[in-house]
Amino acid sequence: MNLSPSLLVAASLVLMGCSAQQQDTVAAAPARAPAPQPAPDPAPDPALLFAAPGEPLPPGGQTTVHATGRNAFSLPAANLEDAERTRFVIGNSFFKRNWVQAPASTTARDGLGPHFLARSCGGCHVQDGRAQPPDFHNPLKPQPFAGLLMRLSIPGEGPHGSPVPDPVYGDQFNTEGVLGVKGEGQLRIRYEQVHGRFADGTAYTLEKPVYELAALNYGPLASNLMTSPRIAPQVIGLGLLEHIPESEILANAAAQAALGGPIKGQPNYVWDAYGERMMLGRFGWKANVASIAHQTASAFLGDIGITSKRFPHQTCTPAQKDCLAAPNGNGAEGVEIEDRVLDDVIFYQATLAPPARRNASDPAVRRGEALFHQAQCAQCHRPSYKTGAELFPALSPALSSKGLSGQTIAPYTDLLLHDMGDALADGRPDFKASGRQWRTPPLWGIGLLPDVNNHQRLLHDGRARGVLEAILWHGGEAEAAREQVRQFSAEDREALVKFVESL
């Protein structure tokens, strides 16, 4: 009997939710032969979909690197060719070095601003890792806001269903300005404590951030303004995620719907400047970006103030006269970053390797993996995929590497939107995403955040101070999974965290 991809995924998700005893039974069953892989979108591989706990995969397939420490997120895919490694190094240079205000003698790197959040990509994605919110618990040690941005919009839909920017401050609140240009204002945070208990009586305290846009330099904000804080995530494995066949992601949604439970993931569809069409969203906290190329070019503009061919206009609004009057750093192409440089940065981000798992055979980690499946975490955090063709074949090899195709990977995500409940809701739609929905983030590399970034702040705004706090913030579709974890013993909670941190 021939099974559709949706039914195959549905069956896998049911198996993922079984008890440890049931999972052991599945593991003992004969492995099914992989189905033939048609190009460009291979059908789901039954051997992967029915994989049971206790069978660890290299997170990035042949791209995986064995690394820990400060540089664990900064290494090229292990299977890159020599010429590709040269491009990786060039892209890394432009990702990490600061841009300067124009005009300057360093014409290859001038054009910063007029408004900006950081002077480089690496200013937010430090060591290619995750940013953290400023620590306002210590007023004697102020910290910059680099890495945390505030999206802005008002009700309605713009072109292609995009959010409508605030008429004065645009679609992003930029606190910094170059010499002679005022920053847009200050972003302030305070925290409210949320108390709770596990079923065994152990108390816990969460911290809920409350935001304020203050010291506004261009007049009042719209009275019906909607805001959404977003923290900069780690950027490992992006090219592999981009190579997951769209059919697999849509099969995830179909399978979840077929199960009839509370988990019902939805795809987002967004406008992509490189594809020049509506495409499936894969990146961003609301799956509001379809490609690494679009994300990179739009971040250069929005976060650093650097124009490119597909984003040639600054974000200054009519009310921001000093911003409009500021000089630019345009080069021969009439923009501030040439395509060849931008392509190298895109290639760099596409080929950053996921690091290998640690302690995968530890008994506590294996126990935690069984609990992860028992709590049905794997229904959203789908463990494995087989990558397919690149997203933009016509632009190859400028933006990608052939070594990213045909890889068996373990990112632990379905790349779908889920209603995460009132506590995490921002109330701000983003294309097809509602104000209660967030994309399932990949879990690979999460245990190395303390090594790379000296913290483990998680979720879309960095409010969670570790894995267990992140789980406790889950609501909406994930409420049942959260409540299962609340019922776990202290030993089981520790094992669950150890498993997630081994990824």
Residue ranges and their predicted role:
Residues 8-16:
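Bacterial N-terminal signal peptides
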Residues 18-503:
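Periplasmic c-type cytochrome electron-transfer domains
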